[in-house]
Amino acid sequence: MNRVFLFGKLSFDPNKLQTRTNNIGASFSLACIDSSGFNDSKSYIRITAWGKVASFVLTLKPGDSVFVEGRLSTYKMNNRSDDPNSKATYALQVIADKVYRPDEENSLEQPVDKATVIDSPFLAAKTNATENELAQAFPISLDDEDDDINPILNNDSQLEEESDDE
């Protein structure tokens, strides 16, 4: 099972992504505090979202608290192209299926499959949930279409700098 649950604050404005088929995406860094209680270290996690989830993410600002549910994925980082000895490296990221603002009741509304089971840690099980309540609790993202991505990245160096600080 590949599921990730994160809570943290946006490190900087989300970067807008767009595929050749005009699918909208967003990538951002989430600053998460170590919850083990042993230290106060932060981890900066790269997160990518697609479709309606990305449209919602693009409205967020640095410092906004969000809850992210998704899955781990790898992505290829091309090193300097002018260096013939440079090899591609791979890194982990989270592909966000759901993004919630804990301080907003209607942070994201999307269609929901009626067969969805309520398993959110933030909602008590409710047998008479309305369609709108289910849609708010369990947004469904569009298929990941991360091929042929034309990223509009202007904050990746900032992400690396933040990761080195801690």
From Swiss-Prot:
Residues 140-166 are annotated as: Disordered. GO terms for cellular component: nucleoid. Keywords: DNA-binding. InterPro entries: NA-bd_OB-fold (IPR012340), Primosome_PriB/ssb (IPR000424), ssDNA-bd (IPR011344). GO terms for biological process: DNA replication. Residues 1-103 form the SSB domain. It holds the Pfam family SSB. Disulfide bonds: none annotated. It comes from the Bacteria. Homotetramer. This is Single-stranded DNA-binding protein. It comes from Mycoplasma pneumoniae (strain ATCC 29342 / M129 / Subtype 1) (Mycoplasmoides pneumoniae). The gene is ssb.
